[in-house]
A protein has these predicted regions:
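OB-fold and OB-like single-stranded nucleic-acid-recognition modules
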Residues: 1-216
Length: 216
């Protein structure tokens, strides 16, 4: 029902986490609020509510539209940038990035954590985040601007990386035995911004889909 609502009223946002396959409009704890619908248009939010009520959702005794600072980045200052000196993957999959001070990409950070694990010394990055009491910055968005990558052997269709068998010999997959031309490939990482999945974002965090949109 929430998927149908999202499709019918596309200006509503953050209704669902497609990765976790769950709705984000209902509270996680017991409370008198049935659901909260966020959107760019007041009228679409009200229409989406009426749609849910007509389609069999639990009946509400009343409703109201509020203007809030959710999904606006109201808690963040300007973007920061720096050069990676080293990284360290900690227990649990959290990643520590040293850029003169410490950036933390938690395992729950999804694409932010995935990019953090691939960073190498010399990479130029940009980020948004909040500083904790220890001075560490908890990353909310991350982007690789420039990064040189070592050449690596290509991957086999089974997922393993081909390995050399010697001079003038084809590469061979150590898992399935498939052979491949003897060559190197360069790993290229996208310079797009990365963000956590909707379930692990702060309420104030602006989704990439809202970047450039006015809050007025």
């Amino acid at each position: 029902l929430v998927i149908e609502m999202s499709n019918r009223y596309p200006s509503t946002i953050l209704n669902r986490d497609p990765n976790a396959r769950r709705s984000l409009i209902a509270p996680r704890t017991p409370c008198p609020v049935l659901y909260g619908i966020r959107g760019e248009s007041r009228q679409d939010v009200l229409d989406a509510h009426e749609f849910l009520q007509e389609q069999g959702a639990e009946k509400s005794s009343g409703h109201r539209a509020h203007r809030t600072n959710q999904a606006t980045d109201d808690h963040l200052s300007s973007v920061s940038s720096g050069v990676v000196s080293n990284t360290r993957t900690m227990k649990g999959g959290h990643v520590e990035i040293n850029v003169g001070h410490t950036l933390l990409a938690f395992s729950q950070g999804g694409d932010v954590n995935s990019l953090a694990q691939k960073l190498t010394p010399g990479d130029q990055i940009e980020w948004y985040g909040l500083q904790d009491l220890d001075g560490n910055i908890h990353l909310e968005r991350l982007r690789l601007i420039v990064g040189e990558r070592n050449k690596v052997r290509p991957r086999c269709g089974c997922g393993s990386r081909f390995k050399s068998q010697g001079t003038n010999q084809p590469l061979r997959c150590p898992s399935c035995g498939l052979e491949h031309d003897n060559l190197w490939v360069t790993e290229i990482l996208s310079s797009e911004w990365r963000e956590p999945s909707p379930s692990y974002r702060r309420h104030l965090a602006k989704p990439l889909s809202r970047m450039g949109k006015s809050e007025v």
